[in-house]
Amino acid sequence: MENRWQVMVVWQVDRMRVRTWNSLVKHHMYVSKKARGWFYRHHYETDNPKISSEIHIPLGEAKLVIVTYWGLMPGERPWHLGHGVSIEWRQGIYRTQIDPELADKLIHLYYFDCFTASAIRQAVLGRPVIPKCEYPAGHKQVGSLQYLALIAWVGVQKRRPPLPSVTKLTEDRWNRHQKIKDHRGSHTTNGL
């Protein structure tokens, strides 16, 4: 019998991102209770020695499974150390890989309160509204002018600790362009 290969998309991440992600998920499962119904599977509970953790997030009849891996091939940089993340959407026997942005949108849709378009009308009528989104990683689009005005009026409040974002987990913070802190003066006087 010949070998059968299965190909899947795995995002390379550094190990500190994986540790932070797991800590945030556990905090919101057990302390803040915002992640109700989520299931965390440890590395010793799986048959695959490459899996470091699995998080099962129910989405109605379907579920989102976020698997973190260790011991993969060495990464492009020394700090990657062969760590990776795969994101899978499952419903019945159907499975498909999805990207981090879509995963964040699905989590946002099912689990967290958000400012909706009808909230502008509710605010104008004097009814109470939810003026903020609990999970802003779930939608990146620019809001309407009314939404932006209401946000400016209410103000943005930071959450501690933040809610776990799949996009934040998979982003490559090491290969982003460096921001120059001081633009005053010429480059020659700043020693650049």
From Swiss-Prot:
Any single GO molecular-function term of the entry would be: RNA binding
Q: Which Pfam families match?
A: Vif (PF00559)
Q: Where is this region: Interaction with host APOBEC3G?
A: 40-44
Q: Which parts of this chain are annotated as the region Interaction with host APOBEC3F and APOBEC3G?
A: 54-72
Give the intrachain disulfide bonds: none
Q: Outline the segment boundaries, as ranges, of region: Multimerization.
A: 151-164
InterPro entries for this protein? Vif (IPR000475)
Where, per the database record, does this protein carry Phosphothreonine? T96, T188
Ranges for the region named Membrane association are 171-172
Chain segments carrying region Interaction with host APOBEC3F: 14-17, 74-79
Membrane topology of this protein: Peripheral membrane protein
Q: Which GO terms describe its cellular component?
A: host cell cytoplasm; host cell plasma membrane; membrane; virion component
Q: Which residues carry this modification: Phosphoserine?
A: S144, S165
Instruction: Cite the post-translational modification comment.
Output: Processed in virion by the viral protease. Highly phosphorylated on serine and threonine residues.
Residue span of motif BC-box-like motif? 144-153
Where are the stretches annotated SOCS box-like? 151-180
- Localization per Swiss-Prot or TrEMBL: Host cytoplasm; Host cell membrane; Virion
Question: Which function does this protein serve?
Answer: Counteracts the innate antiviral activity of host APOBEC3F and APOBEC3G by promoting their ubiquitination and degradation. Acts as a substrate recognition component of an E3 ubiquitin-protein ligase complex: mechanistically, Vif hijacks a host cullin-5-RING E3 ubiquitin-protein ligase complex (ECS complex) and the transcription coactivator CBFB/CBF-beta to form an active E3 ubiquitin-protein ligase complex that targets APOBEC3G and APOBEC3F for polyubiquitination, leading to their degradation by the proteasome.
Q: What other facts are recorded?
A: Vif-defective viruses show catastrophic failure in reverse transcription due to APOBEC-induced mutations that initiate a DNA base repair pathway and compromise the structural integrity of the ssDNA. In the absence of Vif, the virion is morphologically abnormal.
The domain-related comment in the record is:
The BC-like-box motif mediates the interaction with elongin BC complex.
User: Per its record, how is this protein called by name?
Assistant: Virion infectivity factor
